[in-house]
Amino acid sequence: MVAAVGMASIAGYQWWTAPPGIAATPPLLTIQPPVTGRPAPLVLAEIADRAAALPAPVTAGRTEKVTIRAWYLHGQVSGGTTISALQAERRELVRRPDGSGTIVGSKEPPEFQSEADRREWASDHGGQRTTTWAAGGRSFFNQHRPPSTVEQLRQYLWRPNPPDSNGSVKTLQAMREVLRERALPPGERAAFLRLMAERPELRHEGRAQDRAGRWGEVFSVDSAYAGLPARYSFLLDADTGAFLGYEHMLTTTPGALNVRVPAVTTYETFLDGTFVD
């Protein structure tokens, strides 16, 4: 017997409500397959060329603002069983040229599959928090701007942790870290896309609408880099090369999480990445 699956929503966003005993997870992207089946490197190169042709903003001495709306599946072991909860978050980073800045983060109450799980939950129950720091008071992925050439960007993103090579998943994860803290002008976006185009495992999945209602092209790679087989995806604006979203989806097994695969465990929507003064 197949259990029914419905939808729930909050603040204009939706997620799946799962059958009893199964935690809620964000809905999968509905992807329209590409018509021509052209290889991912070619599609990315064309998007990169369009991004590079856009006028560059004056960035010297300017403040960056990065706004992210995200959904995370959290797990907690209690009494020998795993409790999973879906939590929506919003994060607004303001980063000034001298390195000082502010993060305003808000977390909505976690969603549980039962009241019993809610009572057992010992982690964050939501709320808002503002963090400020002076120049030099916070570490970032890199204190310098991302380079606009592929060779320099490859070195910029490299990190000496296993595996000790800049593989496809490590590259995408490093890009994600930068996107969470930097506004990328067109030249830097183009370099990101051209570096992505070098990854041999990367696939062009097709076209999809993100959770903010924007259309973009989906590029993915499959890997068990984090321990479980998963799909790592970016959603890109085909006209500007802007990164619209990031998704991490378990593909074949949920491990200890009480979810049904395929299951999205992380979805981040990059709502704003601009220079504001």
Q: Predicted regions span which residues?
A:
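Intrinsically disordered, low-complexity prosegments and terminal tails associated
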Residues: 4-277
